[in-house]
């Protein structure tokens, strides 16, 4: 009589293959690992949501996906974007500035959620958005990739380097 707790390695009859099997001690150790807590990624405060659209070179308007406006890996410039941030369903006021090719810094007030130019084929090079102290964002810039996360009220991207922002990602910290 062979105890199941001592069986290790056997042949599967159904498909005639070798199966390494596990001892009871190994299975108990595995179950113990499953019971341990795991690290969980930070979660946005309840009720904060992002939505918007990006106006992309040769594509037009694209919806935000995974808190990201724009495209990555396609080499296409971000020309304009709209952004709506809600906290528990209430739209949050947004203002800020963008740095636009051949124009420079352009300030925006709380009466708009549209940043940039449409129909002028001008790249956005840097952004500064004021939308509350829990919002962070970063820019994906040509020839650089993703820049560092910045807080609301700080510049993301580059100025005076002639590099286009291709995407902007948002998160709550």
Language-model segments: which ranges?
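Lectin-type carbohydrate-recognition ectodomains
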Residues: 39-173
């Amino acid at each position: 009589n062979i105890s199941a707790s001592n069986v290790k390695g056997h042949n599967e009859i159904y498909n005639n293959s070798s199966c390494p099997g596990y001892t009871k001690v190994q299975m108990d150790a595995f179950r113990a690992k499953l019971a341990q807590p795991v690290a969980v990624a930070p979660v946005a405060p309840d009720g904060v949501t992002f939505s918007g659209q990006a106006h992309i070179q040769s594509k037009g308007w694209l919806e935000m996906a995974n808190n990201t406006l724009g495209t990555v890996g396609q080499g296409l410039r971000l020309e304009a974007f709209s952004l709506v941030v809600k906290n528990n369903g209430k739209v949050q006021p947004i203002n800020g500035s963008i740095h636009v090719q051949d124009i420079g810094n352009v300030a925006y007030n709380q009466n708009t959620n549209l940043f940039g130019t449409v129909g002028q084929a001008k790249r956005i090079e840097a952004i500064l958005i004021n939308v509350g102290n829990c919002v962070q964002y970063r820019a994906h810039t040509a020839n650089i990739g993703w820049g560092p996360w910045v807080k609301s009220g700080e510049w993301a991207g580059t100025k005076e380097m002639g590099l286009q922002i291709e995407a902007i990602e948002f998160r709550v910290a």
